[in-house]
């Protein structure tokens, strides 16, 4: 594995990320959610892609792709491992979203290219990174109240908003992926909340990928 080459690719790709609002349709008619996991001891990469109507946030379509994992887990290079399955799921969608939430980092990455940014560049769609853990940078401790907010900073640059979306839950790290500003990323996530820790697009993507009860109930209703 030539990490120097991958690192150079990351730096080059990161320079092409658009950190300004460039939505083709604003407000969007459809918002997507994406989640990636691994099966069979990491040998299979599974990507779930969901499509929600906006502003109702009703689930209207989902696709799950499973492919052979193409590279091992290497911290800082996860997007190279995840994007092939994401691309496979994306290509199956009959309707593409106007805005995509990705479970993972956007520019809140040591080389400013998390999976939300990498995938957003690949398919040229506005993306937002919604991550559950910090990858780099520092932030002031949050109060325990829901709605508590702090800027994630690294080398004098704001990379994300750290936002406690729900009481007694760890905060989310919300960042530009591609073609969405940092402040708009936070605003869009806040518009897509329904009382859970995660915004609806990534909550549904996780539910589909993991076969959670909410998704099982949804399937039964569709029959």
Curated annotation (Swiss-Prot):
CDD domains: Endonuclease_V
Site (Interaction with target DNA): 73
Reaction(s) this enzyme catalyzes, per UniProt: Endonucleolytic cleavage at apurinic or apyrimidinic sites to products with a 5'-phosphate
Entry annotated with the keyword Endoplasmic reticulum: no
Main location: cytoplasm
Keywords: Cytoplasm, DNA damage, DNA repair, Endonuclease, Hydrolase, Magnesium, Metal-binding, Nuclease
InterPro entries linked: Endonuclease-V
One of the protein's GO biological processes: DNA repair
Taxonomy, superkingdom: Bacteria
Cofactor section: Mg(2+)
Cellular compartments annotated: Cytoplasm
An annotated Gene Ontology molecular function: deoxyribonuclease V activity
Pfam family, one: Endonuclease_5
Family from the record: Belongs to the endonuclease V family.
Task of the protein: DNA repair enzyme involved in the repair of deaminated bases. Selectively cleaves double-stranded DNA at the second phosphodiester bond 3' to a deoxyinosine leaving behind the intact lesion on the nicked DNA.
Protein name: Endonuclease V
Organism: Salmonella arizonae (strain ATCC BAA-731 / CDC346-86 / RSK2980)
Lineage: Bacteria, Pseudomonadati, Pseudomonadota, Gammaproteobacteria, Enterobacterales
């Amino acid at each position: 594995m030539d990490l120097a080459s991958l690192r150079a690719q990351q730096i080059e790709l990161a320079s092409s990320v658009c950190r300004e609002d460039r939505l083709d349709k604003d407000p969007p008619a459809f918002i997507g959610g994406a989640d990636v996991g691994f099966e069979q001891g990491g040998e299979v990469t599974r990507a779930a892609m969901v499509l929600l109507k906006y502003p109702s946030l009703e689930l209207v379509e989902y696709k799950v792709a499973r492919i052979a994992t193409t590279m091992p887990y290497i911290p800082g290079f996860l997007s190279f491992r995840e994007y092939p399955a994401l691309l496979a799921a994306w290509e199956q969608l009959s309707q593409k979203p106007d805005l995509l939430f990705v479970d993972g980092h956007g520019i809140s990455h040591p080389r400013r290219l998390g999976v939300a940014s990498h995938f957003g560049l690949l398919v040229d769609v506005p993306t937002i990174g919604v991550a559950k853990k910090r990858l780099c940078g520092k932030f002031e401790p949050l109060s325990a109240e829901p709605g508590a907010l702090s800027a994630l900073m690294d080398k004098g640059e704001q990379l994300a908003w750290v936002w406690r979306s729900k009481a007694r839950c760890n905060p989310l790290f919300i960042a530009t992926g591609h073609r969405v500003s940092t402040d708009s990323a936070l605003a869009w996530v806040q518009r897509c909340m329904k009382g859970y820790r995660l915004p609806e697009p990534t909550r549904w993507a996780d539910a589909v990928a993991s076969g959670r009860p909410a998704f099982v109930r949804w399937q039964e209703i569709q029959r």
